[in-house]
């Protein structure tokens, strides 16, 4: 009979040495991002990257509510204002220059959206927290000036979240899909016929084909082209001018890239991820008129700071509503 010390034994080697091993996507084209700018030596939950018409970068930190403005040429960091609403999660810029800020509130039922100037003045409630039960995480404008937003509620066995469309007059809210678990990132294809949505706690990517009215789903048009693996799950996303989709993987320190049909075609790794550093990658966004992608992440679990990283993507970023 074989002694215990002679039994076959598992060892940590190869992929099992990583804090966040990549299994199903290990054969994809893979590049590692370069550090671009340190936002803070403190771990801040960075999110909401968006560029204005002058090429200035806006972003926020969720838990403290700081709104940051960065000059990409000088790397100067300013903090023009602090959100008056709890747990802001995304910034989108209207073509009139106003910032639309999504906020999560109490993470249960007090989220909403407000608009303000870049200095935080002239605040207008777009979706009020006291008259709805949404927990709003992200949004994307269409060319008419309406927008889609994600409802971040629920968990894996209690899918309360969904996706809604708000008409350009901001008065009518129409449900697109419902009963999903923590709807998070959202992006709209160049022709505005395909809506992409990430479902974080179910680890799924939704591809929703829309009719011309922008709210009716085409027959058999709501599909799930991809199931992610690992903890935690897909976060914010954006498209490039080839209609490729870039999805930040929260808790994994990487960005996955999909073609317009939802097939994975590449991935971007954050340095230090195998050792468990900078895993909270939340949002990718292109510098306008370039293929240079900026990615935000932080190292809260390991006591590190908050960083922006950069790579070149497959194509230039898509010039969305604020540039039209």
Swiss-Prot record:
Annotated compartments: Cytoplasm
Cofactor(s) for this UniProt protein: Ca(2+)
InterPro entries xrefs: 6-blade_b-propeller_TolB-like (IPR011042), SGL (IPR013658), SMP-30/CGR1_Lactonase (IPR051262)
Domain of life: Bacteria
Transmembrane domains' residue ranges: none
GO cellular component, one term: cytoplasm
Classification via Gene3D superfamilies: TolB, C-terminal domain
Gene Ontology MF terms in the entry: hydrolase activity; metal ion binding
Record-listed Ca(2+) 2 binding positions: 109, 111, 129, 132, 134
Binding site for Ca(2+) 1: 47, 137, 184, 235-236
Keywords: Calcium, Cytoplasm, Hydrolase, Metal-binding
Active-site residues, Swiss-Prot/TrEMBL: 235 (proton donor)
Keyword Cell inner membrane tagged: no
Group of enzyme by EC: hydrolase
Cofactor binding: number and manner: Binds 2 Ca(2+) ions per subunit.
EC numbers for this chain: 3.1.1.-
Purpose: Exhibits lactonase activity. Acts in cells with perturbed membrane integrity and is possibly related to the membrane homeostasis.
PANTHER family linked: LACTONASE DRP35, LIPOPROTEIN-RELATED
Family per record: Belongs to the SMP-30/CGR1 family.
Name of the protein in its database record: Lactonase drp35
Gene assigned in the entry: drp35
């Amino acid at each position: 009979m074989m002694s215990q010390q002679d039994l076959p034994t598992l060892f940590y080697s190869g992929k099992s040495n990583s804090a966040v091993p990549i299994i199903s996507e290990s054969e994809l084209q893979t590049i590692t991002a370069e550090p671009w700018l340190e936002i803070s030596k403190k771990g801040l939950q960075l999110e909401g990257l968006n560029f204005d018409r002058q090429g200035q970068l806006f972003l926020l930190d969720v838990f403290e509510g700081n709104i940051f403005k960065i000059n990409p040429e000088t790397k100067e960091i300013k903090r023009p204002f602090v959100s008056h609403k709890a747990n802001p999660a995304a910034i989108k810029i209207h073509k009139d220059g106003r910032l639309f800020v999504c906020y999560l509130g109490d993470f249960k039922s007090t989220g909403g959206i407000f608009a303000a100037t870049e200095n935080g003045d002239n605040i207008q409630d777009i979706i009020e927290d006291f008259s709805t039960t949404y927990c709003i995480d992200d949004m994307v404008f269409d060319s008419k000036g309406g927008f889609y937003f994600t409802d971040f509620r629920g968990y894996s066995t209690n899918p309360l979240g969904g996706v809604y469309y708000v008409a350009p007059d901001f008065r009518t809210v129409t449900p697109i899909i419902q009963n999903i678990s923590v709807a998070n990132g959202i992006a709209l294809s160049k022709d505005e016929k395909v809506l992409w949505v990430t479902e974080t706690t179910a680890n799924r990517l939704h591809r929703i084909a829309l009719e011309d009215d922008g709210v009716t789903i085409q027959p058999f048009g709501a599909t799930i082209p991809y199931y992610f693996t690992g903890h935690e799950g897909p976060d914010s996303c954006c498209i490039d001018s080839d209609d490729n989709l870039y999805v930040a993987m929260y808790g994994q320190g990487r960005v996955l890239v999909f073609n317009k049909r939802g097939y994975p075609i590449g991935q971007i790794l954050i340095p230090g991820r195998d050792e468990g550093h900078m895993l909270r990658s939340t949002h990718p966004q292109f510098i306008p008129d370039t293929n240079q992608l900026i990615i935000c992440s932080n190292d809260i679990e390991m006591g590190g700071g908050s960083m922006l990283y950069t790579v070149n993507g497959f194509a230039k970023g898509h010039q969305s509503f604020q540039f039209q």
